[in-house]
């Protein structure tokens, strides 16, 4: 007798057999096709005890059916046809189509039809492990003794033992290392999975998620079988879980039977290290979703109707193929069966492309991608940009040389059939998941966060916990902290305005080596849907979206870029000043309207890009020139700069006292004295939970006092510049103050924006303007520098110089042409202030705009 390990491959031997169930009278047992040649002349019983097949008329014989499906209750040992559990997940001995009047006939289809993620396992051979020939009278045995003898062909999985072990695991397992945050609402001293079954009864979602680490600590052998033979073992788990559930809750009504979903398999592989030994095994990989397809209908059961006599029949899909009936069983007409689509059964299917995470990539390598297929309720569970741990079965499918020829290539195509998604990342903030919002925080954690929010110095403590290794820059850290919290989302569509931007945009600019990039990297590693990109290595389509041909459907599809992938997150853009003009132009719509309009290759759509932009830029001369404005230093268009709520300068002061304090701070990162070790720092996990809770549950609204304070602040800002003929504020500055005030109220866990929030927003906004919008010639804050690209004094000086030049030309009399160089020297000699060539050119352009003169080459001609 061959052992299970030496049996042929289960892939090759999953076809059905037409054998009859064993009888207790000693008749010859018909062997499977592989054994038929050896036993056709023999009168003794064959070595292998076959499985009864489904569609034959053997339903009247309860012996074969009781073997797999009879309930443990003693009253059901004499099972009749109506008592057979025909909806068992393993479909051993079940009919190939639905049978009317079966138990739970209201459930559409068996779990084998409802679990396309496990592939087709309708007909599975079983092997008798006993090497001795049993006597004829010994064949009449109990269900338990027969179950102990049988394993699934090609494996060492004993169905009865496997089911018994899993039931024992569900009923007894208590996790000694369980954390309360991960098991909200569960008693950690009671069996976890029995409480999960109770949740299923209350909520009605028939999915039981099983941690493979729990299974491995409870039963190593059962865990090994699950990893090696998931296609055979998971249906057994389904069967065991359903038996426990319906025995405990017999009156419960579910949409379909409970499906067990294992996750966190120890066989976690890097995506690039998957190899042929992992095929058909349970694996867990991690990565970032970069593309999801549309929902694809996949046929599970075909409905055929005879065109002659209207006889109907159903055929299940086996390994992606339909066995079309060639002869009608009712009228014996050949080739008369037609497929009726609207009577067939379909399941949802979706293709997901998963890309390797940057932290898993070896140095100098490009990221690998793999194809996932999600089925039924796993469709639309993840979106592009999500970082997920995926548990599934690794598959290899042949590729045909020609679709019309059955020859296949020797190289197979691989994919993963998804069984479980887990959107978790310990290093990042909790993602806002609509399904798990209520389960994110325990009552104790919420109480601790609210106690922390009641402290008067919580704003400063949170800011100091943000990037503690970076010295000083308190106002910049406070601005980034408010960006992480964000404002309150509002909808003004009834007024015709549309959506009001709630995200805060921040620009950091200054000398090289002032830790701008470190701040960006810190924020990128903190937020759940963050993207990090560099200005020089980014293109317009890489930031927005581009059209590509889908390799599966050969149709044009839209591939999203960094700004769309960071929707509801933060997009960090380094080297912002080195972007080319076409790349920067796509940011205008995103930074104000929070949408992205696409019209390419016949695809016209508008994508959501509700992302905050945190950008860093270096000055053109490699060092900040205090005699130039911000726009002149970083060479960015004023239309883009005006969309940033806060623009901070990070300059190197070149002061000995500052240098000494900075050096002391850097050395302290490597060596801490006892006094420094005693200093209290806010835990990083607390900071993440604090921000996540505020973003999810705190939505402050403006109060009456805060509204009046905002109005007064805006009027005061306008009043400052009106006396000097310059504009010091625009409506965008007022909206920025509103967003910053709401974010500061979120820091305090306040549902109402108060005057204290407006005062802090005013102070932070004023500090940023002091640095970025100060006119270097007058030392006065002039918002026109950011909105129009030129300060009011520069504009006034330009107009005055143009008038002086005009008077100089008029004093020369009616001369039709003047030499450029001579006119420039005459102007310099007449003017008291120093006149540069650029200023002279600007004056000429101003007069040219008035149609007073024109410049051709080195000659100035009057009009």
Swiss-Prot record:
Its EC number(s): 3.6.4.12
Record bears the keyword Amino-acid biosynthesis: no
Keyword DNA-binding included in the entry's annotation: yes
Annotated compartments: Nucleus; Chromosome
Motif (Arginine finger): 642-645
Catalytic activities: ATP + H2O = ADP + phosphate + H(+)
Function: Acts as a component of the MCM2-7 complex (MCM complex) which is the replicative helicase essential for 'once per cell cycle' DNA replication initiation and elongation in eukaryotic cells. Core component of CDC45-MCM-GINS (CMG) helicase, the molecular machine that unwinds template DNA during replication, and around which the replisome is built.
Name by which UniProt lists this protein: DNA replication licensing factor mcm4
Organism the protein comes from: Xenopus tropicalis
């Amino acid at each position: 007798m061959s052992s299970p390990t030496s049996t042929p491959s289960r892939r090759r031997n999953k076809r059905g057999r037409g054998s009859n169930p064993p009888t207790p009278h000693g008749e010859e047992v018909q062997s499977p096709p592989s054994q038929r040649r050896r036993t056709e002349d023999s009168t003794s019983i064959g070595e292998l005890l076959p499985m009864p097949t489904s569609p034959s008329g053997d339903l009247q014989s309860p012996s074969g059916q009781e073997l797999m499906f009879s309930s443990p209750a003693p009253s059901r040992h004499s099972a009749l046809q109506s008592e057979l559990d025909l909806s068992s997940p393993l479909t051993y001995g079940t009919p190939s189509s639905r049978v009317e009047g079966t138990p739970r006939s209201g459930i559409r289809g068996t779990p084998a039809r409802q679990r396309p993620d496990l592939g087709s396992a309708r007909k599975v051979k079983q092997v008798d492990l006993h090497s001795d020939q049993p006597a004829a009278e010994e064949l009449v045995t109990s269900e338990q003794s027969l179950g102990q003898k049988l394993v699934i062909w090609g494996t060492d999985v004993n169905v009865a033992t496997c089911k018994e072990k899993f039931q024992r695991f569900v009923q007894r397992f208590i996790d000694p290392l369980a954390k309360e945050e991960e098991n909200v609402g569960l008693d950690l001293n009671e069996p976890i999975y029995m409480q999960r079954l109770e949740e299923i009864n209350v909520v009605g979602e028939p999915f039981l998620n099983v941690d493979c680490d729990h299974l491995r600590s409870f039963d190593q052998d059962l865990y090994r079988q699950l990893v090696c033979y998931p296609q055979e073992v998971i249906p057994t788990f389904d069967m065991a879980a359903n038996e426990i559930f319906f025995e405990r809750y017999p009156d419960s009504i579910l949409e379909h039977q409970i499906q067990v979903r294992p996750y966190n398999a120890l066989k976690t592989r890097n995506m690039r290290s998957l190899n042929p030994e992992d095929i058909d095994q349970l694996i867990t990989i991690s990565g970032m979703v970069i593309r999801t397809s549309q929902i694809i209908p996949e046929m599970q059961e075909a409905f055929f109707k005879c065109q002659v006599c209207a006889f109907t029949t159903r055929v299940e899909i086996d390994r992606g193929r339909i066995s079309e009936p060639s002869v009608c069983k009712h009228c014996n007409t050949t080739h008369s069966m037609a497929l009726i689509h609207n009577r067939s059964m379909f399941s949802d299917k979706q293709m997901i492309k998963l890309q390797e995470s940057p932290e898993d990539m070896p140095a100098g390598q490009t990221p690998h991608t793999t194809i996932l297929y999600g089925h039924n309720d796993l469709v639309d569970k993840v979106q592009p940009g999500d970082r997920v741990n995926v548990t599934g079965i690794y598959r290899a499918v042949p590729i045909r040389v020609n679709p019309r020829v059955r020859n296949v290539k020797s190289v197979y195509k691989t994919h993963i059939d998804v069984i479980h998604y887990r959107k978790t990342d310990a290093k990042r903030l909790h993602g806002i998941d609509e399904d798990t919002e209520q389960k994110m925080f325990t009552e104790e954690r919420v109480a601790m966060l609210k106690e922390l929010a009641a402290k008067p110095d919580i704003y400063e403590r949170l800011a100091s916990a943000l990037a503690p290794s970076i010295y000083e820059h308190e106002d910049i850290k406070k601005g980034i902290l408010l960006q992480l919290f964000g404002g309150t989302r509002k909808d003004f569509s009834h007024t015709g305005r549309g959506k009001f931007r709630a995200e805060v945009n921040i620009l950091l600019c200054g000398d090289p080596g002032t830790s701008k990039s470190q701040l960006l990297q810190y924020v990128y590693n903190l937020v759940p849907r963050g993207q990090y990109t560099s200005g020089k290595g980014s293109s317009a389509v890489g930031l927005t979206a581009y059209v590509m041909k889908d390799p599966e459907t050969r149709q044009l599809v839209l591939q999203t870029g960094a700004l769309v992938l960071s929707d509801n997150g933060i997009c960090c853009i380094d080297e912002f000043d080195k972007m080319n003009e076409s790349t920067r132009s796509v940011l205008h719509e995103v930074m104000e309207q929070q949408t992205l309009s696409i019209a390419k290759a016949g695809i016209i759509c508008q994508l959501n890009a509700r992302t905050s932009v945190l950008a860093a830029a270096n000055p053109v001369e490699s060092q900040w020139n205090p005699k130039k404005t911000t726009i002149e230093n970083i060479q960015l268009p004023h239309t883009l700069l005006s969309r940033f709520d806060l623009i901070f300068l990070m300059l190197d002061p070149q002061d000995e006292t500052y240098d000494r304090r900075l050096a002391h701070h850097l050395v302290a990162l490597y060596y801490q004295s006892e006094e420094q070790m005693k200093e209290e720092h806010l835990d990083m996990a607390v900071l993440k939970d604090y921000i996540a809770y505020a973003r999810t549950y705190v939505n402050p609204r403006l109060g009456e006092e805060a509204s009046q304070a905002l109005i007064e602040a805006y009027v005061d800002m306008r009043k400052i510049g009106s006396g000097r003929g310059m504009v010091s504020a625009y409506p965008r500055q007022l909206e920025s103050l509103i967003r910053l005030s709401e974010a500061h109220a979120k820091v305090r866990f306040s549902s109402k924006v108060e005057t204290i929030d407006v005062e802090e927003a005013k102070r932070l906004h004023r500090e940023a303007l002091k640095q970025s919008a100060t006119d270097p010639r007058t030392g006065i804050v002039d918002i026109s520098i950011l909105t129009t690209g030129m300060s009011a004094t520069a504009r006034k000086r330009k107009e005055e110089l143009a008038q002086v030049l005009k008077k100089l030309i008029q004093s020369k009399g009616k001369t039709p042409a003047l030499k450029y160089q001579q006119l420039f020297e005459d102007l310099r000699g007449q003017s008291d202030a120093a006149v540069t060539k650029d200023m002279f050119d600007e004056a000429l352009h101003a007069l040219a705009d008035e149609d007073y003169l024109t410049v051709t080459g080195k000659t100035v001609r009057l009009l």
